[in-house]
Regions:
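Mobile, glycine-rich extracellular loop/lid and propeptide segments
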Residues: 1-198
Length: 198
């Protein structure tokens, strides 16, 4: 079975982000209801615990086969959250059956949201649309940014072709839009991936 990835049915797996000026804590939770496992993003008042900014919002994951899933038992959100210039960034790794053909699909996602209205998802980036690994785990470390607001993440071992698949790479994105603007991939990425020593 797939018990090695869990079982993870509920809780918070990543480091939340606290926006001190607005007194807001942003976090992602995994919940289980009616045999479905769902991830949700929350904005909470740090003084009262009450929801803010149209939260919680159910997270969804678009696949290359044009279907979108919200029941994602194998999706894990381990990477620390980041908020920059009123945009919230969340990264994921998943091991989920692709709805197109039910093969076990493994890839990473980065999603950006309007931090003042979590019902507004701004962009989604999928690291390996072919489902050939490349999840975003980062050993729980957070998403990084530079002084210009560009966003940086590292993908795990996976397929790389420099076109649509970006496993085993460090990726640089434009703010908000998640447009991929640069990346680094080691020359021996295939060896590192196949030997699981990335």
């Amino acid at each position: 079975g797939d018990s090695w990835i869990g079982p993870v049915y509920h809780g918070i797996l990543s480091t939340p982000f606290v926006d001190v000026p607005t007194g807001t804590l942003y976090t992602v939770t995994m919940g289980r209801k009616d045999k479905e496992s769902n991830l949700s993003v929350h904005a909470l008042d740090i003084y009262t615990g009450k929801p803010k900014y149209n939260s919680p919002q159910l997270l969804s994951f678009p696949f290359a086969g044009a279907e979108t899933l919200t029941n994602v038992k194998g999706a894990l959100q381990r990477v620390g959250l980041l908020m920059r210039n009123d945009v919230l960034y969340i990264a994921f790794g998943n091991i989920v059956p692709d709805p197109k053909d039910q093969h076990w699909s493994q890839e990473g996602f980065v999603q950006s949201f309007n931090a003042r209205d979590l019902s507004q998802r701004l962009a989604v980036f999928q690291s390996t649309p072919t489902g050939r690994k490349g999840g975003i785990w980062q050993a729980g470390r957070g998403i990084a940014s530079d002084r210009d607001g560009n966003i940086y993440i590292a993908t795990a071992g996976g397929r790389y072709d420099g076109v649509t698949n970006f496993g085993s790479s460090v990726l640089k994105f434009a703010p908000s839009s998640l447009k991929l603007i640069d990346w680094f991939t080691p020359h021996n990425h295939e060896f590192l991936f196949l030997q699981n020593i990335d």
